[in-house]
Regions:
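Alpha-helical transmembrane bundles and membrane-interface segments of multipass inner-membrane proteins
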Residues: 1-183
Length: 183
């Protein structure tokens, strides 16, 4: 249970309040810089927890359970704080909302499908969706650290919209599978 991969996953969950704390004050470029470094570190641990678990035969039920939760907590927290600080504002909130709602819906669908003993493997497109989400949010955090480079914010918002589109497509894939198994 207390394997290195599981500890790395837990460290991501524990780091979320720190990440949010550094993003709390809009306009504090140093805070955004620290948050960006922490966000990158969290992304690296996300990669290594899975890699270490698979390569060392340390895959556990706890890790399988916690890893997607850690990812969703991090994404949801960053989206919410960036909306709260208006780093994601106006029409761009729609893209953020699409991402949040899809994550909630797919979590519910996965729970339902597990109860009817249907496994839905993560598709390659869903992996690209996650990557684009993480790049978008990282870009938006980085934009706060680089206030003299407004194009970084624009790139982050464009990536957020790209992630929202992939979110809808992959969400529809999960919904189609779920609908086949509903009464």
């Amino acid at each position: 249970m207390w394997t290195l991969p599981n500890l790395l996953t837990l460290s991501r969950i524990v780091a979320v309040p720190l990440l949010v704390g550094f993003l709390w004050w809009p306009g504090w470029a140093a805070g955004y810089g620290i948050a960006f470094a922490l966000y990158c570190l969290m992304g690296i641990t996300d990669y290594f927890d899975g890699y270490l678990a698979r390569s060392n035969g340390a895959v556990s039920r706890l890790g399988i359970f916690l890893d997607p939760i850690a990812d969703k907590i991090m994404v949801a927290a960053v989206i919410l704080i960036l909306v709260g600080t208006r780093d994601i504002a106006c029409v761009h909130v729609i893209a953020a909302l699409v991402i949040l709602l899809r994550e909630i819906a797919v979590s519910g669908l996965r729970e339902f499908l597990a109860q009817v003993q249907v496994s839905v493997p993560v598709s390659q497109l869903a992996k690209w969706k996650t990557t684009l989400q993480l790049v978008a949010l990282g870009g938006l955090i980085l934009a706060g650290a680089l206030p003299n480079m407004p194009w970084v914010h624009g790139v982050g918002l464009a990536a957020l919209w790209g992630a929202a589109v992939l979110t809808l497509v992959t969400g529809w894939d999960y919904l189609r599978v779920g609908l086949k198994h509903m009464d």
